[in-house]
Swiss-Prot record:
GO terms for cellular component: mitochondrial inner membrane. PROSITE patterns: RRM. This is Mitochondrial escape protein 2. The gene is yme2. Gene3D superfamilies: 3.30.70.330, P-loop containing nucleotide triphosphate hydrolases.
Length: 864
């Protein structure tokens, strides 16, 4: 710097900040000097009206001796600027705007710990260093003005957000503002000032031609200005300056990028134009210097001139984005839903697939842990050697598996073949389907997935169904609770745009996501075992899966078609997913079901495939006896009770014959025998429980949605109880009066409810049997109850009488129609005789039914 500047800087001896310019200080040092001061000064001197104001030409000797004599900002003067919004100029006073003296993007350095809502003027009161750049802008301004320029600086108004300051000065008579501006610019060219926060740019100065607006609003400078054209007089209209005029007015402040005028057909007033600079600092200079400037008439401003009103214009307004979003909900809401779905797929799907793999591999399960497995094996060996204990069979199922070894071998053979079809294990409840598949056939399979449809179907509501389906395959995280919230959002969106936005996913879509992620995990489990040096390394993934059916995981779908309805989304999605697994050679799929109509839903998924089916029935009496004896022997060996004597078990064969070969009933009897009951007592308990269940579910039930009637159920019970072979011909049942209308539907529903079972030959229904072997004894017990039997027989007779009366009514109506003819044609004679015979037969039936009904009523009145 020049000598004058050095003299001034060294005039204050005790000031540690005078040796170097505050503009060249680092941010940390500047902030430290500003905010670590002891206390704010108790008094400020207002330059306006102050006798100690100075000139830069010849400063008085005492100018820098006392800090109180420095011209500085006062809170009162700033309050007046913010209240009036303008800087008043008197005669011989001018105004300059100096740019790039405050860091616009580093205001936190100057504001310190102050809240953003407090004005900068409050910050100045808290700083005890008036010579610093942050507290006294005049210390910066004095380096801008050359020493030989005789001007008196009256006031400095900082514009922190814009990075500059207004300088109000007093000039001598005969000195023009343009001369002062030129002198300052020449001085800055010779002695450029580069602030510490932006050392690559210099401080710039321009004369203020308009009347700037001083405000403390939160308006961020931008390179784009909105220039509005206001009339110079209230009785006049503002002229619309040309592009050339605007260019000549604003080009001096910096490089212009574009000038965009208001469309000529626009009705918006006042008229405006957009002036865009190459950099924001040029726009800051232009706004502060040209705001309030009046274009003269000779320059195209009209008779009274055109005044400019300038504001910053953001290229993309947040309000514009908000307005567009609110005005286009049909586009925005579905787009947001799609974006959320895309983020979910991108972020969560790999995580969910990983957890499903963990579930399939079962690396966290105790039974799959190699270390614990080895320890368990060694302990088992020690027990065998030391105590002579053989492996126990707590349920005594060894006899059952020996009898069904052929089915187990057949199933294992199918799992090594490359056939794209389902494997169905069908059998009544309690026939041991799950144990046969999981404990025997798949005992040594490493990867298997078990899906229990009963748990999913019994869940209440879509949210619970989704959570249970996800839990069975390890699909997590699952935000099933979000579905309810999303449904409300969808409902609100439907009210706004008329259609659903897609925020909430239906049960169909959620299940599809779960099963699709499971399929991806199953495929990954197989392919993860591939190695580069395998002999099949040259095969593609699809070819590898097809070539190694023995490596595929096994998906077991238990309780298939449990509580199924005509249109069930759960079973529909499961069958579609299972068909995809088998078709893509990803996994073997085994269905375990008690429903005899399983072929119908499965054929929709694989219409051109023949399913491989294993039907599990009741075991033979010999196998049942061995099962019970093995169960009791194992209990005696592992427990404290002695084995039962032969005399105690003398009625075992007859009891097993009553129970048949149903595993669950045999096991229940074995448990009751272990508890101390005799075989006959255990069987009687089973019969009593089954009797109560049948009465509650089929006879005394008030369910109006059942597809059968109480009369139909009781008719079947009586006929099966009195049958010598324990079965009825299927067609004989359909020919009875109670089953003529909806006979097949009722029989299928009763079979589904497991009251009866229908045996087929070559796919055609042949015989009707009790649903369980023990049900034959139950049916006999029910028919032996005279009161119950009489009441239900009376209901059957009442229904038959009603049916015959309806038939007679139809016959009489037709006879009445034929009798109304003027002549009786000879051809109608046979028809009339047939109708009369029908009426006669129906009336005879009614008479017989009424006789039987009277007898039953008499029995009921007597109470036995």
């Amino acid at each position: 710097m020049d000598d004058g500047g050095n003299d001034v800087d060294s005039a204050e001896d005790g000031d540690p900040c005078d040796a170097s310019c505050p503009l060249l200080m680092s941010p940390s040092k500047l902030a430290s000097n500003c905010f670590n001061s002891a206390s704010a000064r108790s008094s400020r001197v207002n330059v306006r009206g102050c006798d100690t104001s100075f000139r830069w030409g010849r400063p008085p000797p005492s100018l820098f001796a006392a800090k109180s004599s420095l011209a500085r900002l006062s809170s009162a003067s700033h309050a007046s600027y913010l209240e009036t919004g303008h800087i008043d100029l008197k005669k011989n006073e001018g105004l300059l705007f100096i740019n790039n003296i405050f860091p616009r993007k580093l205001q936190w350095v100057l504001e310190g710990s102050l809240r953003a809502s407090r004005p900068y003027e409050e910050a100045l009161k808290r700083i005890d260093r008036p010579h610093l750049a942050a507290s006294d802008p005049l210390r910066i301004i004095r380096r801008v003005f050359p020493h030989e320029l005789e001007v008196e600086i009256k006031e400095v108004v900082p514009r922190f957000r814009e990075g500059g300051a207004f300088v109000k000065y007093t000039r001598n008579e005969g000195v023009k503002d343009t001369d002062i501006e030129t002198a300052v610019k020449d001085h800055l060219e010779k002695h450029p000032i580069r602030p510490w926060f932006n050392p690559f740019q210099q401080v710039k100065v321009a004369s203020v031609l308009g009347r700037p607006w001083i405000e403390d609003l939160y308006r961020i400078p931008s390179p784009r200005l909105r220039v509005e054209f206001l009339p110079g007089s209230a009785n006049d209209l503002a002229n619309d300056p040309t592009t050339e005029s605007l260019y000549s007015l604003f080009r001096s402040y910096g490089k212009l990028r574009d000038i965009e005028r208001q469309p000529s057909d626009s009705k918006i007033l006042p008229r405006y134009a957009y002036v865009e600079f190459a950099r924001p600092k040029f726009a800051v200079m232009a706004k502060n210097c040209m705001h309030g400037f009046t274009i003269a008439e000779k320059e195209g401003g009209g008779k009274f001139g055109t005044r400019l009103k300038i504001n910053y214009e953001r290229k993309i307004k947040l309000s514009m984005i908000k307005d567009w979003i609110l005005s286009h909900p049909r586009i925005v809401i579905p787009a947001v839903a799609a974006l959320i779905a895309a983020i979910t797929v991108t972020v969560f799907d790999p995580i969910r697939t990983f957890f499903i793999k963990m579930k399939i591999k079962a690396t966290l399960h105790v039974e799959e842990n190699s270390v614990l497995g080895w320890i368990r094996k060694q302990v088992s060996k020690a027990n065998i050697i030391g105590l002579g204990v053989v492996a126990s069979d707590p349920r005594g199922l060894t006899a059952i598996w020996e009898d069904r070894q052929g089915d187990i071998s057949q199933l294992q053979s199918w799992l090594t073949e490359n056939t794209e079809t389902f494997i169905i294990i069908h059998g009544p409840r309690g026939s041991g389907k799950r144990e046969l598949v999981l404990d025997q056939a798949l005992e040594n399979y490493k990867y298997k997935v078990v899906i229990d449809c009963k748990q999913i179907q019994d869940a209440r509501g879509d949210t619970a169904k989704i959570a249970r389906a996800a839990g069975q395959v390890g699909y997590r995280p699952v935000f099933s609770w979000m579905n309810s919230i999303s449904s409300f959002i969808d409902l609100a969106a439907q009210g706004m745009i008329g259609t659903k936005a897609g925020f909430s996913e239906t049960l169909d879509a959620q299940l599809s996501n779960i099963w699709q992620s499971t399929a991806t995990a199953l495929k990954g489990v197989i392919l993860d075992s591939r190695k580069k040096n395998d002999k099949d390394a040259h095969l593609t993934d699809e070819e590898y899966l097809e070539a190694h059916p023995e490596l595929r995981p096994v998906v077991v779908i238990d309780n298939f078609l449990h509580n199924a309805s005509e249109d069930n989304v759960v079973y529909e999605k499961i069958t579609e997913w299972a068909a995809g697994l088998t078709s893509a050679n990803i996994a073997h799929v085994i269905f375990l079901t008690t429903d005899v109509s399983f072929a119908k839903p499965l054929s929709k998924a694989l219409p051109n495939s023949v399913f491989r089916t294993i039907s599990l029935g009741d075991c033979s009496l010999e196998v049942g006896r061995r099962f019970v004896l093995n169960h009791l022997a194992d209990e005696a060996r592992t427990g404290d009770k002695p084995p039962r004597s032969e005399e105690y078990l003398e009625d075992l064969d007859s009891c097993i014959e009553i129970l048949g070969g149903r595993v669950t009933d045999l096991e229940f009897m074995a448990h009751r025998i272990e508890a101390g009951e005799t075989p006959n007592g255990a069987v009687n308990r089973i019969i009593e429980q089954s009797t109560s269940e049948i009465l509650k579910m089929f006879i005394l039930s008030t369910n109006t949605e059942a597809q059968w009637s109480h009369e139909q159920v009781w008719h079947l019970i009586k006929m099966l109880a009195n049958s010598k072979e324990g079965s009825l011909p299927y067609n004989q049942v359909l020919l009875s009066d109670l089953f003529k209308e909806n006979g097949e539907v009722a029989l299928q529903a009763l079979e589904q409810a497991e009251l009866i079972s229908v045996s087929s030959i070559n796919g055609c229904p042949e015989t009707v049997k009790p649903g369980k072997p023990v049900y034959r004894a139950v049916f006999k017990k029910l028919t032996e109850n005279k009161t119950l039997s009489s009441r239900l027989d009376l209901e059957i007779l009442s229904r038959l009488i009603s049916k015959e009366n309806k038939s007679i009514g139809k016959y009489e109506e037709e006879l009445r129609l034929l009798g109304s003819l003027p002549k009786q044609p000879r051809e109608l004679t046979s028809r009339i005789q047939w109708l009369l015979q029908k009426v006669y037969n129906s009336q005879n039936k009614i008479s017989r039914y009424e006789t039987e009904s009277a007898f039953l009523q008499m029995i009921l009145r007597r109470g036995h």
